[in-house]
Design a protein with these regions (language model features):
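Non-catalytic terminal and boundary segments that flank Rossmann-like NAD(P)-dependent oxidoreductase
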Residues: 1-39
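Conserved glycine-rich cofactor-binding loop
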Residues: 44-45
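Conserved glycine-rich Rossmann-like NAD(P)H-binding loop of the short-chain dehydrogenase/reductase
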Residues: 60-78
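The beta1-alpha1 cofactor-binding region of Rossmann-like NAD(H)/NADP(H)-dependent oxidoreductases
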Residues: 72-73, 97-111
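Rossmann-fold cofactor-recognition segment
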Residues: 82-104
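Conserved NAD(P)H cofactor-binding loop of Rossmann-fold oxidoreductase domains
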Residues: 127-137
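Catalytic loop of short-chain dehydrogenase/reductase
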Residues: 132-133, 143-145, 151-152, 157-161, ...
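C-terminal helical subdomain
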Residues: 219, 223-225, 231, 236-277
Length: 277
C-alpha cells in the first residue's frame, strides 16, 4: 500500500512490497508537480484511482485535479477519499462522468479544463489512462466494422482528440511545463495471438504519442507500462485466458510513475516499463 503525508515542506511516500508487510523502500522528497492542472482519465478504478491518490500528494496549493470516468458514483467516492488531502492543500477537484468514446464526453472534459485555464497554472499534466480489453478472439473473427471502430474510438481516437483539445486550451508559453502520459502495455511492443484489438490500440497509441514528442519539443511525453496489476481488467484477462499471473497492487506502479514524473529526466517519447526502471 502507498501512503503519503505532508510534513512541513516535505512529502514522504512509502512503498510496501515485502510479504511480511515491512516497507522495503523509504524516500522523502520536497519536490512537487507545481501549481498544476492534472487530468486523469479512467480515474474511478484500479490504476487511475491509485494515480489520483499519488498525484494529489504532490500538487501545490491552488492546483486543479480533473478526474474522468464513466461512473459518477465511483468518482464521487474517490473525491471523498481525497478530501482530507485536497482540503489541506487547497486543491480544486472536478469529477466528470463521461464516455470518452463520444464527442459529448470529450467536449465536456475539454470545457471543464478550459474554465480552469488561468495564468497561475505552471504545469499541465494529462494522464491518458482510460482503456478497455475488448474482444479476445482470433484475427479472422473481426469482420464487423462497427465493433472494431467502437473499440478503437474509445481506446485510440479519444486519447488523440482529448490531448489535442487540451493542447489548444493550454498552448505552450514561457514558464508552462507540459507533460503527457500514455498508460501503455508490453503488448504495445509484443504481438499476442487473439489480442489483435488490444495490441493494435496500444501500439498505435505509442506511435501517436511518439509523433507528439517529435512535433512538440516543449511537451514531455512518456508511454508507461505499469505491468500486470490487481484490476478488473486483469481479472478479465485471467478469466478469459486461464493464465494466472502474480498481480501488482496498483499503488506500486503508480508510485513509480510519480517518481519518474518528479525526476523528469526521461527522454520525451520514451516507453518505460515498471520492471525495468
Amino acid at each position: 500500500m502507498t501512503q503519503c503525508c505532508s510534513v512541513t515542506n516535505e512529502t514522504y511516500f512509502y512503498h510496501q512490497r515485502k510479504s511480511d508487510g515491512m516497507p522495503d523502500v523509504y524516500s522523502a522528497s520536497p519536490r512537487t508537480l507545481g501549481k498544476c492542472i492534472c487530468i486523469i482519465t479512467g480515474a474511478s478504478k484500479g490504476f487511475g484511482r491509485a494515480l489520483a491518490h499519488e498525484v494529489s500528494c504532490f500538487l501545490m496549493s491552488g492546483s486543479v485535479l480533473i478526474l474522468v470516468a464513466r461512473s459518477e458514483n465511483l468518482l464521487q467516492q474517490l473525491k471523498e477519499e481525497l478530501q482530507s488531502i485536497t482540503e489541506e492543500q487547497q486543491l480544486v477537484v472536478h469529477c466528470i462522468a463521461a464516455d470518452l468514446s463520444t464527442k459529448e464526453g470529450l467536449n465536456e472534459t475539454v470545457r471543464v479544463a478550459r474554465q480552469e485555464a488561468v495564468n497561475e497554472i505552471d504545469h499541465v499534466l494529462l494522464i491518458n489512462n482510460a482503456a478497455s480489453l475488448g474482444n479476445i478472439s482470433q484475427f479472422a473473427t473481426f469482420s464487423d466494422l462497427d465493433e472494431v471502430n467502437s473499440y478503437l474510438s474509445f481506446n485510440l481516437s479519444s486519447s488523440l482528440v482529448l490531448t489535442a483539445g487540451i493542447l489548444q486550451v493550454f498552448p505552450c508559453r514561457p514558464g508552462l511545463r507540459w507533460t503527457v502520459v500514455n498508460v501503455s502495455s508490453v503488448f504495445a511492443l509484443k504481438a499476442l495471438p487473439c489480442w489483435v484489438l488490444y495490441c493494435t490500440a496500444k501500439a498505435a497509441r505509442n506511435m501517436m504519442f511518439n509523433v507528439l514528442a517529435k512535433e512538440e519539443p516543449n511537451v514531455k511525453v512518456l508511454s508507461y507500462s505499469p505491468g500486470p496489476m490487481d484490476t478488473e481488467l486483469q481479472k478479465d484477462i485471467q478469466r478469459l485466458t486461464g493464465v494466472i499471473n502474480q498481480l501488482l497492487p496498483c499503488q506500486e506502479p503508480a508510485a513509480k510513475l510519480m517518481k519518474l514524473l518528479l525526476d523528469n529526466d526521461f527522454p520525451s517519447g520514451a516507453h518505460l516499463d515498471f520492471f525495468t526502471v
